[in-house]
């Protein structure tokens, strides 16, 4: 069935910033999608169009992107009469109309809002759940429930503390099901809250953008120590492992790294890529650390390559790859990392997200589906991770409704699949091999 009407509006994300929401109507009803927004953004990401009118929302309005949907994209898609199940055809048309390399004409936030809504409408048109429609688009006969990576300690650009590294995550890989993984994650989270409260006081249990705690600690090792203690207190030492998102591009300075970048600048404390790599290796040795995201700057290629070759853990590219099939080719060739972070708004369309995922998987990489720090109540990525069979998702701590919206949707999907539900568990890096 073709599109009857498309209408975009400005709504608010979880940080109180405007973002784009799109309503798409077919004869089957209304399909709504909202677009997320990141805080630590890679320089190679598709352009998120903001108004830059300082008199309105401090320049962060998205009325231009909304206008592009309502005045240009909507009439074009309606007049073409394309069936909503033809995701690639519709996405291609929008990309051709935009015509720029990084979606700077309409904005990735405009194109993605429509693309997500089309995908939801396509599922309804076929009379199947969204995750099944996505699996069909990706050519996957089976679907898999992911291991959740809960970001329970926040630092970096997501928090007002001194921590340089951005996210410290727990992954309940030893769970038997997604439902059990949620319970384990929640129990560790509450134990962590008590550990932090006892050690640093009640103020230290305030939460950051993604629902994790942001205690005022300086040493990244201290964050890992807190996780180790909380996991042990919860009684899950054999079931929970640790992941990190360093977001090192945020503290890259003249070829070196500043682990105290929130203090006044002092080049004498900068460390070399090799010293930083040694720090990670010491973490891997002392803690159950199995995944490190963005350990180096997005252009520090040699450091990435060297590190990935010498550690046995998952090395995730985010700022390095920005979910862009064109940016993935080089790290695949150079073996710079071994896992893609998949964020739909970095590339700006469902079709290109699927292409990026397939390219990574076909080269033996893992894929981790991810939210952004500025989120909405939209649950698209929950269905996406199941349909793409990536086996892992990070969408914050088990706290704040915009995070739980995704986790709760995954619980519903597992329930709906019943006896057919498969949980990635310890095979989260390559869940197809069970």
UniProtKB/Swiss-Prot annotation:
It comes from the Eukaryota. GO terms for biological process: glycolytic process. Its cofactor is Mg(2+). Its EC number is 4.2.1.11. Mg(2+) 1 binds at residue 40. Pathway: Carbohydrate degradation; glycolysis; pyruvate from D-glyceraldehyde 3-phosphate: step 4/5. The active site is at 210 (proton donor). InterPro entries: Enolase, Enolase-like_C_sf, Enolase-like_N, Enolase_C, Enolase_CS, Enolase_N. PANTHER family: ALPHA-ENOLASE, ENOLASE. Belongs to the enolase family. GO terms for cellular component: phosphopyruvate hydratase complex. Binds two Mg(2+) per subunit. Required for catalysis and for stabilizing the dimer. Keywords: Cytoplasm, Glycolysis, Lyase, Magnesium, Metal-binding. Mg(2+) 2 binds at residues 245, 293, 318. Its main location: cytoplasm. Homodimer. PROSITE patterns: ENOLASE. Substrate binds at residues 158, 167, 293, 318, 370-373, 394. GO terms for molecular function: magnesium ion binding; phosphopyruvate hydratase activity. It catalyses: (2R)-2-phosphoglycerate = phosphoenolpyruvate + H2O. It holds the Pfam family Enolase_N. SUPFAM superfamilies: Enolase C-terminal domain-like, Enolase N-terminal domain-like. This is Alpha-enolase. It is found in: Cytoplasm.
């Amino acid at each position: 069935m073709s599109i009857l009407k498309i209408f975009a509006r400005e709504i608010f994300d979880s940080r109180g910033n405007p973002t784009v929401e799109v309503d798409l109507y077919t004869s089957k009803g209304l399909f709504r999608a909202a677009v997320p927004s990141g805080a630590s953004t890679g320089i190679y990401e598709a352009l998120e169009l903001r108004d830059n009118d300082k008199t309105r929302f401090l320049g962060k309005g998205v009325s231009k992107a909304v206008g592009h949907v309502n005045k240009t994209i909507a009439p074009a898609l309606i007049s073409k009469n394309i069936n909503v199940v033809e995701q690639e055809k519709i996405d291609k048309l929008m990309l051709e109309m935009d015509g720029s390399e990084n979606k700077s004409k309409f904005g990735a936030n405009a194109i993605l809002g429509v693309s997500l809504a089309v995908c939801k409408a396509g599922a309804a048109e076929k009379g199947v759940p969204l995750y099944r429609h996505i699996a069909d688009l990706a050519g996957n006969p089976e679907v898999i429930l992911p291991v959740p990576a809960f970001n329970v300690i926040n630092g970096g650009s997501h928090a007002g503390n001194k921590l340089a590294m951005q996210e410290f995550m727990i992954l309940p890989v030893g769970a038997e099901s997604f439902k059990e993984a949620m319970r384990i994650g929640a129990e560790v989270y509450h134990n962590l809250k008590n550990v932090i409260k006892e050690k640093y006081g009640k103020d230290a249990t305030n939460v950051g953008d993604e629902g994790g705690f942001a205690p005022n600690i300086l040493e990244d090792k201290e964050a890992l120590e807190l996780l180790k203690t909380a996991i042990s207190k919860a009684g899950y030492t054999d079931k929970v492992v640790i992941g990190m998102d360093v977001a090192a591009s945020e503290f890259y300075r003249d070829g070196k790294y500043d682990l105290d970048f929130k203090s006044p600048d002092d080049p004498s404390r900068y460390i070399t890529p090799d010293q930083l790599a040694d720090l990670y290796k010491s973490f891997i040795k002392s803690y159950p650390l199995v995944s490190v995201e963005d350990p180096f700057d997005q252009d520090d290629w040699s450091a990435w390559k060297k590190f990935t070759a010498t550690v046995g853990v998952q090395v995730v590219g985010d700022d390095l790859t920005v979910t862009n099939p064109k940016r993935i080719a080089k790290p695949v060739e150079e073996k710079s990392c071994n896992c893609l972070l998949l964020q739909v708004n970095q590339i700006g369309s469902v079709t290109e997200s699927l292409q990026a995922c397939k390219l990574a998987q076909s080269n033996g990489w893992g894929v981790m589906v991810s939210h952004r720090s500025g989120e909405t109540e939209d649950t698209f990525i929950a269905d996406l991770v199941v349909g793409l069979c990536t086996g892992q998702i990070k969408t914050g701590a088990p706290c704040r409704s915009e995070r739980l919206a995704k986790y709760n949707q995954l619980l519903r999907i597992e329930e709906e699949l019943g006896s057919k539900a498969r949980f990635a568990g310890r095979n989260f890096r390559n869940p197809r091999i069970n």
